[in-house]
Amino acid sequence: MTKNFIVTLKKNTPDVEAKKFLDSVHHAGGSIVHEFDIIKGYTIKVPDVLHLNKLKEKHNDVIENVEEDKEVHTN
């Protein structure tokens, strides 16, 4: 089941390393849904959590945070 995740890269991540991460997303059968302007981050869609875990292992040195993209409600 495909899911969207918000992935934030570390501030000092070189553009070449960010490109390698994005290439890995595509290679894993995923896609880039959105690229953030203010921070070095992306919303990605991946086929399953296993693919996400492989991306996290491969690019652990540049990934700051990963969280599922879902609705947030306030009361």
From Swiss-Prot:
InterPro entries: PBI_I9, S8pro/Inhibitor_I9_sf. One of its GO terms (molecular function) is endopeptidase inhibitor activity. Keywords: Cytoplasm, Phosphoprotein, Protease inhibitor, Protein transport, Serine protease inhibitor, Transport. Signal peptide: none annotated. Part of the heterodimeric LMA1 complex together with the thioredoxin II/TRX2. LMA1 binds to the ATPase SEC18. PANTHER family: PROTEASE B INHIBITOR 2. This is Protease B inhibitor 2. It comes from Saccharomyces cerevisiae (strain ATCC 204508 / S288c) (Baker's yeast). The gene is PBI2.
